C-alpha cells in the first residue's frame, strides 16, 4: 500500500508540476509579448493558478521522495485548503448561475449580516462600467463576428452562439434588412422610431451591436453556460485532490519506513 501511495503521489504530482510549469511559462511569454484585451482577463488568474499548482505539486514530489514529516504535513495542509476553496467556488458558481437558487438566497441572513445579491452578481460585476468596456474590446479583438464573411447571405440559418446572436446582428424586432451578414439597413417601409438597441446598431465592424442590451444578455448567457461547465470541472478536480490527499495521508503515516522500502 505504501509503495502504491508513493508511486501515485509521485506520478500525479510530476504531471501536475509539468502542467503548472508549462502554464506559467506561457503566461510569462504572453506578458512579455504584450497581452491582448482578451488575454488580460485571464493573465493574472492563470499566473497565480499555475504558480500555486507548480508549488503544491513540487511539495508533493519532495514529500513522496524524501518523506520529510514537515513537508508532508505542509503538502496535506495545502491540499485540504484546495478542497475547501474548490467546494466554496463550486457552490458560489452554482448560486450566481442558477437564477432560482440565487434569488432564494439573496439578501438572506440574521440581523445586519446578509448574504450578497447572487441573482444579479454576474450582471453587476461584468456588464457595467470598465469591465463591460473591456469585454466589448475583447469581443472586437477576438473577431467573434468574423466567422461570417461579407458574402455570407445565409446568416440567420447558421448556428449562432448567445454572444453572436446578441452582439453580431441587430435585434430581430428592429426589422432591419440584411444585405449580407455584415451589412443591415432600415427598410423603406419602416414606420416605427429607431430607438434602443435598434439605434445602437452600427455596420462598423468594431461596433456592431456591442453597445446593445441584447449583447449584454448574450454575454450573460454565455458566462452562465461556461461557468456551469466549470462546476463539473471543479468537482473532478475535487475528486483528484481528495485522492492525492488520501495517498498523502498514507505516505505521512508511514514516512518512517526506510527510503528504499518505499519502492522495493
UniProtKB/Swiss-Prot annotation:
Pfam families: Tetraspanin. InterPro entries: TET_plant, Tetraspanin/Peripherin. Glycans are attached at residue 180. GO terms for cellular component: membrane. It comes from the Eukaryota. Residues 1-13, 67-75, 250-264 are cytoplasmic. It is found in: Membrane. It is a multi-pass membrane protein. One of its GO terms (biological process) is auxin-activated signaling pathway. Its main location: membrane. Residues 35-45, 97-228 are extracellular. The chain crosses the membrane at residues 14-34, 46-66, 76-96, 229-249. Keywords: Glycoprotein, Membrane, Transmembrane, Transmembrane helix. May be involved in the regulation of cell differentiation. Belongs to the tetraspanin (TM4SF) family. This is Tetraspanin-12. The lineage of its organism: Eukaryota, Viridiplantae, Streptophyta, Embryophyta, Tracheophyta.
Amino acid at each position: 500500500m505504501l509503495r502504491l501511495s508513493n508511486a501515485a503521489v509521485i506520478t500525479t504530482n510530476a504531471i501536475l508540476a509539468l502542467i503548472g510549469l508549462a502554464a506559467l511559462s506561457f503566461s510569462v511569454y504572453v506578458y512579455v509579448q504584450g497581452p491582448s484585451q482578451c488575454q488580460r482577463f485571464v493573465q493574472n488568474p492563470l499566473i497565480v493558478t499555475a504558480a500555486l499548482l507548480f508549488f503544491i505539486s513540487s511539495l508533493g514530489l519532495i514529500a513522496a521522495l524524501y518523506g520529510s514529516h514537515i513537508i508532508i504535513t505542509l503538502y496535506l495542509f495545502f491540499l485540504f485548503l484546495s478542497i475547501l476553496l474548490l467546494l466554496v467556488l463550486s457552490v458560489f458558481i452554482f448560486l450566481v448561475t442558477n437564477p432560482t437558487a440565487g434569488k432564494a438566497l439573496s439578501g438572506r441572513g440574521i440581523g445586519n449580516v446578509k448574504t450578497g445579491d447572487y441573482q444579479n452578481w454576474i450582471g453587476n460585476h461584468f456588464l457595467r462600467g470598465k469591465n463591460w468596456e473591456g469585454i466589448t474590446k475583447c469581443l472586437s479583438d477576438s473577431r467573434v463576428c468574423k466567422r461570417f464573411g461579407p458574402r455570407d447571405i445565409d446568416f440567420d440559418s447558421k448556428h449562432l452562439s448567445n454572444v453572436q446572436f446578441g452582439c453580431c446582428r441587430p435585434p430581430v424586432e428592429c426589422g432591419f434588412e440584411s444585405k449580407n451578414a455584415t451589412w443591415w439597413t432600415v427598410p423603406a417601409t419602416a414606420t416605427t422610431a429607431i430607438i434602443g438597441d435598434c439605434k445602437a446598431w452600427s455596420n462598423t465592424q468594431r461596433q456592431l451591436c456591442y453597445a446593445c442590451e441584447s449583447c449584454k444578455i448574450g454575454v450573460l448567457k454565455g458566462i452562465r453556460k461556461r461557468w456551469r461547465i466549470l462546476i463539473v470541472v471543479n468537482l473532478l478536480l475535487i475528486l483528484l485532490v481528495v485522492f492525492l490527499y488520501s495517498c498523502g495521508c498514507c505516505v505521512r503515516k508511514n514516512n518512517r519506513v526506510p527510503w528504499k522500502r518505499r519502492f522495493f
